[in-house]
A protein has these predicted regions:
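Short substrate-entry loop that stabilizes the transition state in hydrolases
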Residues: 195-197, 202-239, 370-374
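Alpha/beta-hydrolase fold nucleophile elbow
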Residues: 263-274
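C-terminal catalytic histidine-bearing segment of alpha/beta-hydrolase fold enzymes
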Residues: 387-441
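N-terminal cap/lid segment of alpha/beta-hydrolase-fold proteins
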Residues: 38-44, 49, 143, 148-195
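Short beta-strand/loop motif that positions the catalytic acidic residue
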Residues: 357, 363-365
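Alpha/beta-hydrolase active-site loop
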Residues: 241-261, 282
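Hydrolase active-site cap/lid region
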Residues: 281-338
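Short alpha-helix in the alpha/beta-hydrolase fold that links the catalytic acid
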Residues: 373-384
Length: 441
């Protein structure tokens, strides 16, 4: 029996695996003990994992269902309730030894087909579009640092085995603290035992809030950094809209980290994505005093601010209470660029002075970014950079949402395998770049 990938749906032997994390469920089915094994390098949500089901009947069809609860997905709409149930399903045929090995046994039907270790997880979808109002205050924003994954093994309508286990965005040794500055609010993630540790500031996009930034900060803090997830508007005590945001929000965040007793003040980096990357570039063109920058889906010009759903007729950013020159939003230019797939001219006065930045830079972006032309921005940043080290990666499937490895991304109607590959590649590039420039060899 062949599937669309030319693989035998009766599967293969699961081979020899080093089980680093093993979860075993036992349940009697006609005097057989069914075992479910989860194999992963760690419990962190940005690590791949394999599922092996042993002691099934040989050459039988089984349905594997995955349910995610309390799952925060960085790629999902901001208003999607985090307690919405996510689900994926795949049908497998056990091999002659009664084994289903997700990394080797092809899925014959369901949420995906063929062989993919993370196919079941990446193809999970929310069962409803239930939305929740976002909290107005930092203290009321949940940590969202873990989620539960339930695996059910089905034959027909009968559950013959099931197990729930936990995946984490944040390692158990990491603590957190809410920080309230004059121009920013943030959530600090740190190991209480850390000494002279490199630190990162994480700034997310045009939502301005802390949820997406903290998701990234939790994972990076679990990899040996003190991380400050920064909110720069949209919360009580901060500007209401993305307009006239003081660059001093980043200056203040950097000063906070430099004074932190556990931080090595000579090893600080910044991660900015989307509008946050624009903010980082604008600020660093005036105060280039960190050791490295990762800019995800960047812009090399200052764009007009946003007030609700409309353009604000002001700059996005200020310095010393003075607006930075900005590129005005013109609907005609925008429609022209989308219809003809050509870039519209950039206002020279709104260009960020990249030549003033000497920190090492990693640029990540898409050649098919649906929000703005990140690809040409990367080209312009590289051409105007006068420092000693700059590198970039461009992707051709994923658009503006290049985020955390393996997290479901249903924004794009593309080959999900390529979307997953690009999310993994861009995330690993981020980790390796920070490690290279901030961790002592």
């Amino acid at each position: 029996m062949l599937n669309g990938y030319g693989e035998n749906c009766r599967g293969k032997n699961h081979g020899n695996f080093k089980t680093i994390l093993l979860i075993i469920l036992t349940k009697k089915e006609e005097d057989m003990t069914i075992q479910i094994e989860l194999i992963s390098a760690s419990e962190l949500a940005d690590e791949s994992f394999n599922i092996v089901i042993n002691d099934l009947k040989p050459r039988e069809t089984y349905r594997v269902e995955m349910y995610l609860t309390d799952y925060y997905c960085i790629n999902a709409p901001m208003l999607l309730a985090h307690d919405v149930l996510w689900k994926s399903v795949a049908t497998f045929v056990s091999n002659e030894n009664g084994i289903i090995n997700i990394s080797q046994t092809p899925s014959c039907s369901g949420s995906y087909e063929g062989i993919s270790t993370m196919g079941l997880f990446f193809n999970a979808k929310p069962l409803t579009n239930m939305r929740k109002k976002l909290p107005n205050s930092l203290s009321k924003i949940p940590l969202l640092d873990h989620f539960f994954m339930e695996i059910k093994i089905m034959q027909g309508n009968t559950v013959i085995a099931e197990k729930t286990f936990t995946r984490h965005y944040m390692s158990s040794q990491i603590s957190h603290q809410d920080i309230y500055g004059k121009h920013f609010q943030g959530r600090l993630f740190y190991d209480k035992k850390a000494i002279k540790t490199p630190a990162l500031i994480i700034v997310s996009g045009s939502e301005g809030r802390v949820e997406k930034a903290q998701n990234i900060a939790q994972l990076l803090s679990s990899r040996g950094y003190i991380c400050l997830a920064v909110a720069y508007f949209g919360l009580e005590g901060l500007p209401k809209h993305l307009e006239r945001i003081p660059l001093e929000c980043l200056v203040e965040a950097k000063d906070y980290l430099r004074q932190h007793p556990q931080v090595d003040s000579e090893r600080i980096g910044i991660y900015g994505r989307s509008k946050g990357a624009e903010l980082v570039l604008a600020e660093e063109s005036l105060f280039n005093d960190v050791q490295c920058l990762v800019l995800n889906s960047p812009s090399d010009v200052v764009y007009e601010g946003i007030k609700g759903k409309w353009n604000s007729h002001t700059s996005s950013w200020t310095h010393l209470q003075k607006e930075l020159p900005y590129q005005k939003f013109r609907l005609g230019d925008y429609l022209f660029s989308k219809f003809f797939r050509k870039t519209f001219p950039k206002d020279c006065s709104a260009r960020i002075d990249i030549g003033q930045i000497h920190s090492p830079i990693l640029l990540l972006g898409s050649a098919v970014d649906e929000i703005w032309d990140a690809s040409s921005a990367i080209d312009d940043i590289v051409s105007h950079y006068k420092g000693h080290y700059i590198t970039f990666k461009k992707y051709h499937e994923t658009g503006h949402m290049l985020t955390v490895a393996y997290q479901p991304n249903h924004r794009y109607r593309k080959d999900w395998r390529l979307l997953m590959k690009e999310s993994k590649d861009s995330w690993l590039a981020t980790i390796h770049f920070f490690d290279r420039h901030l961790k002592k060899q």
